[in-house]
């Protein structure tokens, strides 16, 4: 009897296994019902999430929002961008106000383990730096002892700054603001001698200064800042969609697939390529998406390199070198799990 019961339980379990594996995401259902993706972004950070002269959102983090919408709806424009300060961002995600947070956010132990959040991956490897005016003649961080430093509230930046100065017996005068715009104004007016932020953020802040050429970014880097999108814990289906959307963009670059040449690869003899773009595969089903989900991401948004270069790289005013964000095969550490 016991053996028959065990056999019955096993049979039922295996019968249900596909259903459990393909269980619909509650967040995906919500997103489909509302007909758009609610994506949390910054209040304005050039290169990552900012509004252009035509009133359109643009940036590396915005591209991720659009890639996710393209995967879900087949339309990258079905996104509502919700600007959030660093102080507001996690509460907005936890409460369900937004479906995903794509806002230059550092992946840390505490955030990942105590706040009900899941980090999707890394879309920009960064580090904390400092920007000063050229006329200050400051060349290194130690020269900022007892000086006023502008920093954004509720960020790892402030915590790193405290740790760095305490560990070296240095002091500083914190000048704390909620937004990047406020920090730029304070620096322009001379309220602080230096700004500290992720180096990518410093590049963005510098181009928005009244005289960008008057500021210099120091070579000192005091932290690791892996930045990436975030979703709520408790919805593995949605987490999978969010994670593999980023992986598609990175893998597409590695395979040499761009938005421009994508259709030429439909008849490729490379199974990695045909698998990625959905030729004769059903990978989308396991995510609750159509089988051309990856095709739509690449066609409408592009691969990771395309996104990087137009927003923060050589085709942008920021001109940030790829550095660590180059592919692992090109001297960087950018890497995504294989899609197979």
Cite the ranges covered by each PLM segment.
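C-terminal functional modules
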Residues: 273, 279-340
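Short helix-initiation/N-cap motifs at beta->coil->alpha
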Residues: 79-91, 174-189
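Bacterial N-terminal signal peptides
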Residues: 9-19
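Extended ligand-binding regions for polar small-molecule ligands
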Residues: 63-66, 70-72, 135-138, 142, ...
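Acidic, polar ligand-binding/catalytic clefts
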Residues: 66, 70, 74, 78-143, ...
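Bacterial N-terminal signal peptides that target proteins for export
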Residues: 1-9
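Extracytoplasmic small-molecule ligand-binding "clamshell" domains
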Residues: 23-102, 289, 300, 304, ...
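Bilobed "Venus flytrap"/periplasmic-binding protein-like clamshell domains
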Residues: 38-47, 57-72, 106, 126-182
């Amino acid at each position: 009897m016991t053996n028959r019961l065990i056999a019955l339980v096993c049979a039922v379990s295996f019968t249900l296994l596909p259903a459990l594996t393909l269980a619909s995401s509650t967040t995906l259902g919500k997103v489909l019902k509302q007909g758009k993706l609610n994506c949390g972004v910054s209040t304005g950070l050039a290169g990552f999430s900012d509004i252009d002269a035509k009133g359109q959102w643009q940036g590396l983090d915005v591209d991720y929002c659009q890639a996710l919408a393209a995967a879900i709806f087949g339309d990258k424009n079905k996104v509502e961008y919700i600007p959030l300060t660093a102080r507001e961002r996690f509460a907005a995600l936890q409460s369900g106000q937004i479906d995903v947070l794509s806002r230059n956010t550092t992946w840390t132990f505490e955030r990942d383990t105590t706040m009900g959040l899941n980090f999707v991956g890394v879309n920009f490897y960064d580090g904390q730096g400092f920007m000063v005016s050229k006329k200050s003649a400051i060349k290194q961080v130690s020269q900022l002892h007892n000086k006023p430093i502008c920093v954004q509230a509720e960020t790892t930046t402030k915590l790193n700054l405290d740790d760095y100065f305490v560990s070296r017996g240095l002091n500083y005068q914190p000048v704390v603001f909620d937004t990047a715009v406020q920090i730029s104004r304070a620096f322009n007016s001379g309220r602080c001698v230096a700004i500290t932020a992720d180096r990518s953020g410093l590049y963005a802040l510098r181009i928005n200064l009244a005289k960008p050429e008057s500021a210099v970014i120091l070579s000192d880097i005091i932290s690791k800042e892996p930045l990436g999108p975030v979703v709520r814990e408790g919805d593995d289906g949605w987490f999978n969609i969010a994670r593999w959307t980023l992986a598609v963009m990175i893998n597409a670059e590695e395979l040499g697939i761009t938005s421009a040449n994508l259709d030429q690869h439909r008849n490729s003899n490379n199974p990695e390529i045909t698998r990625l773009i959905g030729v004769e595969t059903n990978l989308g089903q396991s995510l609750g998406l159509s089988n051309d989900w990856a095709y739509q991401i690449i066609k409408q948004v592009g691969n990771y390199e395309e996104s990087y270069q137009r927003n923060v790289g050589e085709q942008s005013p920021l001109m940030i070198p790829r550095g660590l964000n180059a592919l692992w095969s090109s001297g960087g550490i950018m890497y995504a799990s294989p899609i197979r």
